[in-house]
Amino acid sequence: MDRAVSQVALENDEREAKNTWRLIFRIAILFLTVVTLAISVASLLYSMGASTPSDLVGIPTRISRAEEKITSTLGSNQDVVDRIYKQVALESPLALLKTETTIMNAITSLSYQINGAANNSGWGAPIHDPDYIGGIGKELIVDDASDVTSFYPSAFQEHLNFIPAPTTGSGCTRIPSFDMSATHYCYTHNVILSGCRDHSHSYQYLALGVLRTSATGRVFFSTLRSINLDDTQNRKSCSVSATPLGCDMLCSKVTETEEEDYNSAVPTRMAHGRLGFDGQYHEKDLDVTTLFGDWVANYPGVGGGSFIDSRVWFSVYGGLKPNSPSDTVQEGKYVIYKRYNDTCPDEQDYQIRMAKSSYKPGRFGGKRIQQAILSIKVSTSLGEDPVLTVPPNTVTLMGAEGRILTVGTSHFLYQRGSSYFSPALLYPMTVSNKTATLHSPYTFNAFTRPGSIPCQASARCPNPCVTGVYTDPYPLIFYRNHTLRGVFGTMLDGVQARLNPASAVFDSTSRSRITRVSSSSTKAAYTTSTCFKVVKTNKTYCLSIAEISNTLFGEFRIVPLLVEILKDDGVREARSG
């Protein structure tokens, strides 16, 4: 019995001893863990300089300051990022598109010529020097900020005269027409042998050429093909256009005076001709009885045409047959354009009555003088698919000479100020399905033309007139959104008489310093202007082809006046030598 109790007691002592050692072990482990943790914390505090609770209070402030610095840095770089985006996403693709357009135009022209060569119908293609690639038919000055009139023409520059002049005192060269494409230019004028007022016989000079740059860097126009159309056909009022097949020309054929033509009952004969790259001229009469069935007189606008969407577009004008469908649809329609800051004082009802009567001047027997646009498909067949567009007289003034221009992707119609409105007009034009639509015009108040009273240069009220002179403006300065800002042109700076030719840059209300041809008493007549850029030097030039009085050899001499467009804020006046 005692032995059994002793055995139990021994086992209990052993169990208690084991538990005691387990407790000691656990306490030792816990102590070592705490010591290790304390040492680790101490090491961390020492090595990292860890903040105390008081230090942690300032952390949000430091974070805010760092955030402000980062924001400031990003903000200063935003302008750079924006410029990079504009260059990469906007300007570079646009520049590539312009280059692509130029290349495609050249390829189109070459393809026409290759086909012509295959058919033994043409020679090789003339093309401007590489210095001009991308500088013809483009928006030459794109500037949102500068004053338009801070751009101005230099004195006239000496260059090669590519226009033949009269060789006798009775000779007469008149009515120049000019157009230039990305590959070549076209020029024509009328030649009369016995004085400028002879309507019975004349011949037409027609030339094709290219822009060259001389070894010294001068611009010159090089004529490569030309022809004198001296036959039994009396071509008048011719307009020319540079197309992929050469120089397309639209002319009327007349044997009577203008007044007699308007008093006739049938439309005027009209022909579509072409000077090809091989120097050969071909021509085809249009079916005017169908095309101009409602007209008693019809003439090209004299100014150059334009090649758009595989068609050549010309401005035309003339007289409508009374009570014909085309005449009836215009009945009661009119438009009144107003001078800048110079309102007509007449009563509104009287102004409307005068505006309506301005379309039927007495000089042409009371016929409605109408503006129109003729487009013809450009192909190896002449006169193909002609389409006539007659715009409403709620947009256009009385019909007059004009010009179709293409600059960049924009098209315009210039209308001569033959009616009461003296400032130069450029109607924006859109084309679709072979027809054209005209929109409210840009007006250039300081770009006036002389005229007979009551439609002189300073006129401000509607009146029936047939006056003025052809002096077209060329679109030169644009906003970045392609809106037109300013034009270049050579005006006749007289009130009533055709005197004082002067070149300038014009905005809607004013003009730059001017470059005069000579004295204020110099007689002149028609002027037509075209601008281009020498891309290599980034210099912009403008050519004004002007009829200048010539007392020794003929009444007029047609002179190609060349200027460079300069820029500053001066107001001096330049004069040619």
UniProtKB/Swiss-Prot annotation:
GO MF annotations in UniProt: exo-alpha-sialidase activity; host cell surface receptor binding
Cellular component, GO annotation: host cell plasma membrane; membrane; viral envelope; virion membrane
Assigned keywords, A-Z: Disulfide bond, Glycoprotein, Hemagglutinin, Host cell membrane, Host membrane, Host-virus interaction, Hydrolase, Membrane, Signal-anchor, Transmembrane, Transmembrane helix, Viral attachment to host cell, Viral envelope protein, Virion, Virus entry into host cell
Cystine connections: C172-C196, C186-C247, C238-C251, C344-C461, C455-C465, C531-C542
Residues on Intravirion side: 1-26
Primary location: virion
Alphabetized InterPro entries for the sequence: Hemagglutn-neuramid (IPR016285), Hemagglutn/HN (IPR000665), Sialidase_sf (IPR036278)
Residues listed as glycosylation sites in the UniProt record: N119, N341, N433, N481, N538
Free-text note on domains in this protein's UniProt record: The C-terminus (head domain) is involved in binding the cellular receptor.
Assembly behavior: Homotetramer; composed of disulfide-linked homodimers. Interacts with F protein trimer. Interacts with host CG-1B; this interaction inhibits viral adsorption and replication rather than internalization.
Family under the similarity heading: Belongs to the paramyxoviruses hemagglutinin-neuraminidase family.
UniProt function note: Mediates the viral entry into the host cell together with fusion/F protein. Attaches the virus to sialic acid-containing cell receptors and thereby initiates infection. Binding of HN protein to the receptor induces a conformational change that allows the F protein to trigger virion/cell membranes fusion.
The protein's name in its UniProt record: Hemagglutinin-neuraminidase
UniProt source species: Newcastle disease virus (strain Chicken/United States/LaSota/46) (NDV)
Upper taxonomic lineage: Viruses, Riboviria, Orthornavirae, Negarnaviricota, Haploviricotina
Gene this chain is encoded by: HN
